[in-house]
């Protein structure tokens, strides 16, 4: 049974925006179908009831904080690129932690960007979307390797999309098998797969069994759609490897997530680790 006294840590949360379409402009130049060009969020065809975006006069930080308080979320990991995130990190350092989204194609500039953001914002993670890079880059590519060493030097995990991309972009760069080489080459690196790893979720489990540093977070999936292989793994040998992450406000409301979560058949010992303890350890929160 899901406990009611564990304050969750959400490893993928953001802030509603009246101009949410603009934050996906970097992807649109690579999208080719007409329908995607009209979408506000390039993967919106996958989601029902996407949370309403705020009016220009609304306080985005207050909206997210209220949703967190309502659902028992103590800390949210947010990308430092938005103005709302910067305001939240300054005003509420006890409620928000910083991550940085990167594209490894400009290697030296990206390494410098990570180090500068870490110094300014006390980064807790570096994140990346291989299919969304321009051009796309598999996680096993040499362009990522200086990024990984920088993460090791700064004691940061790397979080990377795995599985078929939601936006209509080629997904071969997100084949889960790419992580096998990275784990071999960087045994000190903490790696977290995000966004499902489907249809290779069984392979993701095999690789997590093999590699101590490889983990999985449940971002962008409503709890009723968590892959069965992931739930089974958490309940057996993977209780320390599976971490909670939501997708508010990009595709899911916290209300929906926390309404569905109690129906996930995790064993009792898994819940505190899934909701909180694994995040504290892997992200050094």
List each model region and its residues.
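Catalytic pocket-lining loop regions of alpha/beta-barrel enzymes
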Residues: 124-125, 133, 137-243
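Active-site gating/metal-coordination segments in enzymes
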Residues: 74-75, 81-166, 170-173
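Hydrophobic/aromatic residues located in beta-strands of well-ordered beta-sheets
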Residues: 8, 76, 96-98, 158, ...
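Short, charged, surface-exposed secondary-structure boundary motifs
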Residues: 107-112, 224-229, 253
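N-terminal cationic-hydrophobic initiation segments that often serve targeting/anchoring roles
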Residues: 68, 89-93, 118, 183, ...
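Mid-to-C-terminal alpha-helical segments outside catalytic/metal-binding sites
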Residues: 1-11, 18-70, 238-243, 251-285
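Short active-site segment of divalent metal-dependent hydrolases/proteases
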Residues: 15-16, 164, 198, 250
């Amino acid at each position: 049974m899901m406990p009611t006294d564990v304050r969750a840590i959400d490893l993928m949360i953001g802030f509603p925006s009246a101009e949410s379409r603009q934050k996906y402009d970097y992807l649109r130049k690579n999208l080719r179908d007409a329908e995607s060009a009209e979408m506000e969020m390039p993967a919106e065809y996958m989601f029902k009831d996407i949370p309403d975006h705020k009016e220009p006069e609304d306080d985005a930080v207050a909206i997210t904080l209220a949703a967190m308080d309502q659902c028992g979320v103590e800390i949210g990991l947010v990308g430092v690129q938005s103005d709302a995130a910067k305001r939240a990190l300054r005003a509420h350092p006890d409620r928000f932690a910083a991550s940085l989204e990167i594209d490894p194609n400009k290697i030296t500039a990206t390494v410098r960007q990570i180090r500068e953001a870490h110094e300014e914002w006390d980064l807790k993670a570096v994140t990346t979307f291989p299919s969304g890079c321009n051009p796309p880059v598999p996680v096993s590519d040499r362009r990522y390797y200086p990024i990984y060493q920088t993460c090791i030097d700064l004691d940061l995990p790397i979080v990377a999309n795995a599985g078929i991309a939601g936006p209509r972009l080629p997904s071969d760069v997100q084949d889960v098998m790419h992580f096998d080489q990275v784990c071999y080459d960087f045994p000190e690196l903490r790696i977290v797969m995000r966004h499902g790893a489907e249809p290779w979720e069984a392979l993701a489990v095999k690789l997590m069994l093999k590699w101590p540093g490889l983990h999985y977070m449940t971002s962008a999936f409503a709890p009723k759609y968590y892959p069965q292989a992931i739930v089974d793994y958490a309940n057996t040998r993977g209780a320390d490897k599976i971490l909670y992450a939501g997708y508010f406000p990009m595709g899911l409301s916290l209300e929906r997530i926390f309404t569905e979560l109690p129906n996930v058949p995790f064993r009792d010992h898994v819940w505190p680790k899934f909701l909180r303890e694994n995040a504290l350890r892997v992200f050094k929160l």
